Amino acid sequence: MAASLQASTTFLQPTKVASRNTLQLRSTQNVCKAFGVESASSGGRLSLSLQSDLKELANKCVDATKLAGLALATSALIASGANAEGGKRLTYDEIQSKTYLEVKGTGTANQCPTVEGGVDSFAFKPGKYTAKKFCLEPTKFAVKAEGISKNSGPDFQNTKLMTRLTYTLDEIEGPFEVSSDGTVKFEEKDGIDYAAVTVQLPGGERVPFLFTIKQLVASGKPESFSGDFLVPSYRGSSFLDPKGRGGSTGYDNAVALPAGGRGDEEELQKENNKNVASSKGTITLSVTSSKPETGEVIGVFQSLQPSDTDLGAKVPKDVKIEGVWYAQLEQQ
């Protein structure tokens, strides 16, 4: 009896081991299929050991982590880029083909178009044209002021823009003439030709000014034609200061000053007598590319104009503005 039991036990042991191996093999096959590892078709044997499978699985996890990190970084760059001053500069047709929602929040509305496929010169024939869609986009503002360091004289300093992306002049129109000797002449007549801008100097002082080219008459070679323009007062004559004084309305003197002429003393004269007179600025434009087939012209400009005077109470600062411009010329 004991011998028969021992024989049966000896007979059953390989069967249990075989079933355990079969179960382990099937489980391994399922894991491999789940992670894309193919098993051998003959005999149910695996082409790779379990250790190799786990190593490959770990590598896949690392690769997936890297891809997730890259996707997150890319999303962050895209999100930050949406709040910047715009990405790639578009052509006029590309801008017109976009919807409001496609332009909103991208900075494109504050950019002047560019020209593709043109020539690097002014290639228009002599004649009379009308400049339309004239656009000026500043890319740099500098203000002449005393330096921060000791014993440093006044010089143009780079500034930080405090205004939203609404400083571009656009839809400006006017006659544009090309003479037989190659010179050009442009007169500004209409359009969005001014924009209120505020910049901040490195020391913290904020400088408001009215970026404009009102009544501009510029002439010269296409490589460099310049002219003067009118700079209106930053504030109108009906603007009232905190004490109710204005140019065409409000009090003549500060409130509560005693009579007897003390309100017109020299130190208070500029504050009491508001000055809304306009000043002058100058601008130089250069053509960098043109496309006669479409009538498009692009270039760069540099403008020099005074800042706000607070209705005559402050000495204006010189503001230098650099940027790009775009226009469409239609022959008359």
Swiss-Prot record:
One of its GO terms (biological process) is photosystem II assembly. GO terms for cellular component: chloroplast photosystem II; photosystem II oxygen evolving complex. InterPro entries: OMP/PagP_b-brl, PsbO. One of its GO terms (molecular function) is oxygen evolving activity. It is found in: Plastid, Chloroplast thylakoid membrane. The keyword Cell wall biogenesis/degradation does not apply. The keyword Thylakoid applies. Transmembrane segments: none annotated. Keywords: Chloroplast, Manganese, Membrane, Photosynthesis, Photosystem II, Plastid, Thylakoid, Transit peptide. Its main location: plastid. It comes from the Eukaryota. Belongs to the PsbO family. Stabilizes the manganese cluster which is the primary site of water splitting. Binds GTP after preillumination of photosystem II core complex. This binding is inhibited by DCMU. This is Oxygen-evolving enhancer protein 1, chloroplastic. It comes from Spinacia oleracea.
